[in-house]
């Protein structure tokens, strides 16, 4: 087992918590972050709203039936990004090995940290305290020898808690871990596992690699390792990139049409980033991740720059239409990105 010390930090109901911080009179009420509209979906739900069964990616229409008294506030992605930058500034006091997963979660490798703190649990405790002191928001943390285990651990004491999974306790922990707790195991995969008599990671571990490959294809390699607590992926430090993108990991696997419901707010979020960076883009890429971790991408490249958010959304919807609607596929992530970036006004806009 690896001797690395990995922390997974996950902010608690991040978007909703930021909105509650800005509008404290809403505290204690079920709050939903979403644009209202017939085809809108929830971006985030407060813990009070979750008690009624509301969750991100649920349609607003369904949410209103389940919880008519919920308060709806539109998302403010620029604000979320500002708060996320504050949180990352806290991370950088301890390590430069930071791998952001989204605005509200990240992996940190603190095996060697700037403050020479020997215990990763103490590093996590300090980080969580600093985040709360500086933003008023709570975070949960998982501490483990690798990224896979740290991500599971961060969910164990939510909200506002942390859980340590040392190497010598990993196998016992996995023995009774429900399969649905394994990141990436969605409804489709879980149903197949259960049909094979599996309920826990311990059950999964009793299958040979060849059997898993037979039942799950290439994903069987990953399942074989995860059942044994093995994950050698390094924490990849953030690097400057030649494109701008945004994506969302869905809380449950969704068919293509429902996943497409996220495109409008993804496009709006991405357009804000483009505007803030003062650049223009000539290509649009759609990214989808299936329940078994296959990546599907589609790209459109234009001879001129995208003029506005509407054009960006239209391009993303055109790309979505190019994805074969295979009924057996369920999707756990959707994202869009832009490339072929140029400084604003450098290239004449030929869309007009």
Swiss-Prot record:
A Pfam cross-reference name: IMS_C
Cofactor comment text: Binds 2 magnesium ions per subunit.
PROSITE patterns from the UniProt entry: UMUC
Residue(s) at site: Substrate discrimination: 15
GO cellular component, one term: cytosol
Domain (UmuC): residue spans on this chain: 6-186
Reaction catalysed by this enzyme: DNA(n) + a 2'-deoxyribonucleoside 5'-triphosphate = DNA(n+1) + diphosphate
Top EC class, one word: transferase
CDD domains membership: PolY_Pol_IV_kappa
UniProt-listed InterPro entries: DNA/RNA_pol_sf, DNA_pol_Y-fam_lit_finger_sf, DNA_pol_Y-fam_little_finger, DNA_polymerase-Y, DNApol_IV, IMS_HHH_1, Rev_trsase/Diguanyl_cyclase, UmuC
Cofactor(s) this protein cannot do without: Mg(2+)
EC number: 2.7.7.7
Protein's cellular compartments: Cytoplasm
Binding site for Mg(2+): 10, 104
GO biological process, one term: DNA-templated DNA replication
Function: Poorly processive, error-prone DNA polymerase involved in untargeted mutagenesis. Copies undamaged DNA at stalled replication forks, which arise in vivo from mismatched or misaligned primer ends. These misaligned primers can be extended by PolIV. Exhibits no 3'-5' exonuclease (proofreading) activity. May be involved in translesional synthesis, in conjunction with the beta clamp from PolIII.
UniProt family annotation: Belongs to the DNA polymerase type-Y family.
Subunit structure: Monomer.
Name of the molecule in the record: DNA polymerase IV
Species of the source: Neisseria meningitidis serogroup A / serotype 4A (strain DSM 15465 / Z2491)
């Amino acid at each position: 087992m690896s001797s690395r010390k990995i922390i997974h930090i996950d902010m608690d109901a991040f978007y909703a918590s930021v909105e509650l911080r800005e509008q404290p009179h809403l505290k204690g009420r079920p709050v939903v972050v979403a644009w209202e509209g017939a085809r809108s979906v929830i971006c985030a739900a407060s813990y009070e709203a979750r008690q009624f069964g509301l969750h991100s990616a649920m349609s607003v229409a369904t949410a209103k039936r389940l919880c008519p008294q919920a308060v709806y506030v539109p998302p403010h992605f620029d604000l979320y990004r500002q708060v996320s930058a504050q949180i990352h500034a806290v991370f950088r006091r301890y390590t430069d090995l930071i791998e952001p997963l989204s605005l509200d979660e990240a992996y940190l490798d603190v095996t060697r940290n700037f403050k020479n703190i020997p215990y990763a649990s103490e590093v996590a405790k300090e980080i969580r305290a600093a985040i709360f002191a500086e933003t008023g928001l709570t975070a949960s943390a998982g501490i483990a020898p690798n990224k896979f285990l740290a991500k599971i651990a961060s969910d164990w004491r939510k909200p506002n808690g942390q859980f340590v999974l040392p190497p010598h306790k990993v196998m016992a922990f996995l023995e009774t871990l429900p399969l649905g707790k394994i990141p990436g195991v969605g409804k489709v995969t879980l149903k197949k596992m259960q049909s094979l008599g599996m309920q826990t990671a311990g059950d999964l571990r009793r299958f040979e690699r060849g059997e898993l490959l037979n039942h799950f294809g290439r994903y069987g390699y990953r399942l074989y390792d995860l059942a044994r607590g093995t994950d050698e992926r390094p924490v990849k430090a953030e690097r400057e990139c030649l494109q701008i993108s945004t994506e969302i990991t869905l809380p449950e696997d969704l068919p293509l049409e429902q996943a497409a419901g996220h495109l409008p707010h993804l496009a709006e979020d991405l357009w804000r980033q483009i505007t803030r960076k003062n650049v223009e883009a000539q290509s649009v890429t759609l990214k989808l991740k299936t329940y078994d971790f296959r990546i599907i991408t589609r790209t459109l490249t234009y001879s001129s720059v995208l003029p506005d958010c509407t054009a960006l959304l239209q391009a993303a919807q055109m790309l979505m239409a190019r994805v074969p609607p295979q009924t057996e596929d369920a999707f756990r992530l959707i994202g869009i990105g832009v490339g072929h970036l140029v400084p604003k006004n450098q290239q004449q806009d030929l869309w007009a």
